[in-house]
Amino acid sequence: MEYSNIYVSRIMKLCKERGIAINRLATMSDVKQSTLDNIVRGLTKNPRIKTLHKIAIAFNMTLAEFLDFDELNDYVFDEESDE
């Protein structure tokens, strides 16, 4: 999985588990629908920490809890990569 898709996977998984549609998440998190759509579509490769924090709060999680998942924790960076 590409690094930029890790957050997309996390958001989609949490939405599915909690029965929350993306447009509802936008409202709950006070993140613009277009911003969230761009993240989920992979157009925004590196979402701002403030945006991720708002999304975490919408899921009733701390930012640390939101970022604590296997795909991110186990990610290995390519030595040649600037990601």
In which residue ranges do the predicted regions lie?
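A short, Lys/Arg-rich alpha-helix, primarily the initiator
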Residues: M1-A21
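Short alpha-helical elements of helix-turn-helix
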Residues: N5-S9, Q33, R48-L52
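The alpha-helix within a helix-turn-helix
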Residues: C15, A26, A56
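Short alpha-helical DNA-recognition segment
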Residues: G19-I39
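Short, charged recognition helix plus adjacent turn
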Residues: N38, K45, L67-E83
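DNA major-groove recognition helix of helix-turn-helix/homeodomain DNA-binding modules
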Residues: K50-E65
